[in-house]
Structures are given as structure tokens and as C-alpha cells.
């Protein structure tokens, strides 16, 4: 019989373009799922990989700032065409992150429900709440042999637009103005 829990501890793991320091990974088989937990200087969270149904990621904090090496094409040659992405085998995922830092930017609370519907990936309950401003969104990304299209619809909301802009390192002339902006974007 195989063990129900497996744990790995390492001083550093290079994965996803980033070094994860003082990392402890564990996987535990539970009824109807496997729970993978990660704890390091850069992440503290768990992923519940359900046998059936959506996966669920509960993250207390994440600092993800990948450093990928740039690949240069030969002089005068065009860059290679982008690879097609297929959503068919992607799992549906519920993401809940209490404190997320991505590419050096503190995004704060991040939530998303991603669902796979064949050649379409949908976003419901998309949320980024920095504490200075809030974005909620729904979206759709469709890709198949006949078409490629994307849409994102949502709302930006905050009490003081200058504080929200300053949070992202931008200075604007408007001061102290509340904002409530709806957006509806489509592209192919």
C-alpha cells in the first residue's frame, strides 16, 4: 500500500522562472481528492485536486516574480508564431488568494473561478481588491480552428482615484475623486 502523505523539503527549488526558498511541499490523499500544500518564503497555500469537479487553490500569500531568460531569434528572422493554446484538458479552478504579489506588484486579494467548457475558458467571480481600489470581472477566452475571441466585462471601483493610481506607482492630476467605471472589452 502506498503512503497517504508524501512530503518534500528543500532549501531552494527553481520552478516557473523563480527560485522558491525554504520550500516544503506535501501531498495528502483525502476522500475524493488530493491536497497539495506548499510553504516557503514566497508562497503559503494549498491546492485541492478533486477527483471530480473543480480544483480549489487557497493561498494565504504568494510572491511570484519570474525571471525568464529572453530568447533571441537570429538577426533578420521573424519571431516564431505563437503556439495555439487548447483549453480542452485544463481543469476548472477556484482561486482564492488573500495576499498576492505578481511581477513585483502587490495586487492584494485575488479571486477567480475559471471553468473549462471544451474550447472555451470562462472567468466568473474575478476579483482584484488592492485595498485602494477594486476590480470585478467576468470573461471568456475561446480558441478553436474556426475562431479565436476573448471578452472581459467588469467594474473598477474606489474611493479616491489618486490613491489607487499611486498604489500602482502612477501620479495623476485628479485628487480625492471617487470612481465607478464599467468596462466591456472584446477582441479577436
Predicted features and spans:
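Small-residue helix/turn framework positions
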Residues: 3-14, 39-78, 85-101, 106, ...
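A short glycine-rich beta-turn/N-cap micro-motif
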Residues: 32-33
Amino acid at each position: 500500500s502506498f503512503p497517504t502523505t508524501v512530503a518534500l523539503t528543500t532549501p531552494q527549488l527553481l520552478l516557473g522562472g523563480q527560485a522558491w526558498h525554504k520550500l516544503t511541499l506535501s501531498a495528502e490523499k483525502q476522500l475524493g481528492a488530493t491536497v497539495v500544500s506548499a510553504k516557503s518564503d514566497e508562497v503559503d497555500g494549498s491546492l485541492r485536486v478533486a477527483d471530480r469537479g473543480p480544483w480549489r487553490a487557497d493561498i494565504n500569500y504568494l510572491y511570484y516574480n519570474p525571471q525568464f531568460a529572453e530568447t533571441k531569434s537570429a538577426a533578420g528572422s521573424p519571431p516564431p508564431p505563437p503556439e495555439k493554446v487548447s483549453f480542452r484538458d485544463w481543469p476548472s479552478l477556484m482561486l482564492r488568494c488573500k495576499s498576492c504579489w505578481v511581477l513585483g506588484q502587490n495586487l492584494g486579494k485575488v479571486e477567480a473561478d475559471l471553468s473549462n467548457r471544451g474550447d472555451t475558458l470562462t472567468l466568473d467571480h474575478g476579483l482584484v481588491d488592492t485595498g485602494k481600489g477594486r476590480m470585478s470581472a467576468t470573461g471568456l477566452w475561446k480558441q478553436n480552428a474556426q475562431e479565436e475571441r476573448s471578452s472581459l466585462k467588469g467594474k473598477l471601483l474606489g474611493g479616491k482615484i489618486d490613491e489607487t493610481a499611486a498604489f500602482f506607482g502612477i501620479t495623476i492630476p485628479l485628487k480625492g475623486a471617487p470612481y465607478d467605471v464599467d468596462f466591456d472589452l472584446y477582441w479577436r
